[in-house]
């Protein structure tokens, strides 16, 4: 099988920044995309935008040269999840994710569904603990260990299933690199440049701190999308990362 749209797992750009394209209006999203360079970032499409605009939005972004992270966090029975991941591969997305809490059989099925795509397969990432959750939130659902411990447990399971990495808090990055290895990709939301509001994220870091901790890809939303000059803000963040030893 080959992607009908675009091959996106080529590592063609070096930027670690993934901009969260969180808009309720497609025209606004595409207007933003037209203000930034696909050489400086990738774009993340989540549940709201994909529910509203579907595969057409992904194709529009691909036509503009962007790699797309399809952030739908699939969590279902193994067969359904596998089919959903294969559908994402058909769209040619660069990255797709599932919930690690769906278990080993679900994650293994998702990984197997991508085998026919070979080098054209998207990166398959698992979500460990949402960065909006803290220890109290975990206790509310019967998990008595800390967010860091739960993230490590699920990251190990993800690694055992052969996935490419996990979505995690930057606070867990150092430990997860030690446990799962340098080639295991860490994708981190909750990244806020110095002086930005935390919003609904509870466990946050600056871009510089995230890179120093070993994060491979950092998701940044409002500090860039709500900037009066998004490309300038994006390049300022990239410049700050070159100073990280």
Curated annotation (Swiss-Prot):
Alphabetized GO MF terms: orotidine-5'-phosphate decarboxylase activity
InterPro entries: Aldolase_TIM, OMPdecase, OMPdecase_AS, OMPdecase_bac, OMPdeCOase_dom, RibuloseP-bd_barrel
Metabolic or biological pathway, per its Swiss-Prot or TrEMBL entry: Pyrimidine metabolism; UMP biosynthesis via de novo pathway; UMP from orotate: step 2/2
Positions that bind substrate: 22, 44, 71-80, 131, 192, 201, 221-222
Keywords of the record: Decarboxylase, Lyase, Pyrimidine biosynthesis
A matching Pfam family: OMPdecase
Domain of life: Bacteria
Active site: 73
Gene3D superfamilies membership: Aldolase class I
Function: Catalyzes the decarboxylation of orotidine 5'-monophosphate (OMP) to uridine 5'-monophosphate (UMP).
Subunit architecture: Homodimer.
Family of this protein: Belongs to the OMP decarboxylase family. Type 1 subfamily.
Name this polypeptide is given: Orotidine 5'-phosphate decarboxylase
Organism: Yersinia pseudotuberculosis serotype O:3 (strain YPIII)
UniProt lineage: Bacteria, Pseudomonadati, Pseudomonadota, Gammaproteobacteria, Enterobacterales
């Amino acid at each position: 099988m080959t992607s009908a749209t675009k091959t996106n797992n080529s590592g063609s750009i070096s930027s670690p920044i993934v901009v969260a394209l969180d808009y309720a209006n497609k025209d606004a999203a595409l207007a933003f995309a037209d203000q930034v360079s696909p050489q400086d970032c990738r774009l993340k499409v989540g549940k709201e935008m994909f529910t509203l605009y579907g595969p057409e939005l992904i194709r529009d972004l691909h036509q503009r040269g962007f790699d797309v992270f399809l952030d739908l966090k699939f969590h279902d029975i193994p067969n359904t999840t596998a089919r959903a991941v294969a559908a994402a591969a058909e769209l040619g997305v660069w990255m797709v994710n599932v919930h690690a809490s769906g278990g080993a059989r679900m994650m293994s099925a998702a990984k197997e569904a991508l085998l026919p795509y070979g080098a054209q397969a998207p990166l398959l990432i698992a979500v460990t603990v949402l960065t909006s959750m803290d220890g109290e939130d975990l206790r509310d659902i019967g998990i008595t260990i800390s967010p860091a411990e739960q993230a490590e447990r699920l990251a190990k399971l993800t690694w055992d299933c052969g996935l490419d990495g996990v979505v995690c808090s930057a606070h867990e990055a150092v430990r997860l690199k030690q446990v799962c290895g340098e080639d295991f990709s860490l994708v981190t939301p909750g990244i806020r440049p110095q002086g930005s509001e935390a919003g609904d994220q509870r466990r946050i870091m600056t871009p510089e701190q995230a890179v120093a901790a070993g994060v491979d890809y950092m998701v940044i939303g409002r500090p860039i999308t709500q900037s009066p000059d998004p490309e300038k803000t994006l390049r300022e963040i990239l410049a700050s990362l070159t100073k990280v030893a």
